Amino acid sequence: MKNKMYSMLVFTLISFLFYSYLIIWTPVLSVCSEKISFVNLTNFSMWPKFAKFHYESFEKTYIQSCDIPISKNCFKQILFWSFRLSQKKNICLSKINMLYLDNFPRWTLHFEFPTKTNRKRHVYLDNISFLYLVFATLAFKTMDDSCVNKIPFEVLASHLFKINFSQNKIETIFQDLQNHTEAQLFSRENSEQLFSFTNFIYYFVYNRTDCKNSISKFFYNSVNTRNVSTPFGVTNFSLVRGIMSPIQSFKGNLMFLENKTKVTKPTAIPNAVTSEPTKFFPSTRGTSSMQASQQTSSFPTTFFTTNHSNTST
């Protein structure tokens, strides 16, 4: 009888501690606890040493610069799974030091998106674009005021794209992006638009930097131009050669690593502000002020390409 009472007491104590742990730590772990089965990042263990080194260096910088400190494991999951755009905790990354990525080497991430048919949709994404995608989605998806208020959307819209928006209209645009469901987000149109949106963030961060020399080298060779859609309208972006890994150099500026590839054009965001397609001609005038951001004739294009494969799921 005594042993039985002792066992019940121990069981009760363990149960109490366990549920206390859940109550205390569930809000903290919720950001990093979700596993997304429909997005597969391949060959992470096969990355070359230089890629792993820069990944770890960026991880360290990311953790130290983040407004809300996170663990390394949390960073990795946020990095790998941020495509879902469903972080449950407002994490503001507006103060992250993007200058560290000036000379970040190029390597490719490979994502597989299952479709309703027996085919997989493959996306090969440049790592730089992906890191900025993380920055963009975590900053804008949450719509946290402390993040959003640091970015002068009105100035960016009027100065870069010659479009005048009210604050309410801007909030509506990003609310539309926030309200995309997973099915909508990973549709052909929206996933492509998401990369175009990333490109806008890329340019925004690029224009906020004062490290002109190193960045000018990063964007040194610019060839061709193409129209891409952004929440602020359609504009021309030039294609940057960048620093590519050996496997990418075989394909030039394309991110495809397979045969019979097909480049698809971005489409406009549903319910976004409509405007006439606007050609963007960067100014050569340089200044550090946000009202007149530093301009350059070398401008990064959308770092994405997509194709369909007959590989069965």
From Swiss-Prot:
The keyword Glycoprotein applies. It comes from the Viruses. Induction: Expressed late in the viral replication cycle. Glycans are attached at residues 40, 43, 127, 164, 179, 207, 227, 236, 259, 307, 310. One of its GO terms (cellular component) is virion component. Keywords: Glycoprotein, Late protein, Virion. The keyword Glycoprotein applies. Residues 287-313 have a biased composition (Low complexity). InterPro entries: Roseolovirus_U47. It is found in: Virion. A long 51 kDa and a short 49 kDa protein are produced possibly by proteolytic cleavage. N-glycosylated with high-mannose and complex glycans. Its main location: virion. Residues 274-313 are annotated as: Disordered. Interacts with glycoprotein (gH). Belongs to the herpesviridae U47 family. This is Glycoprotein U47 homolog. The gene is U47.
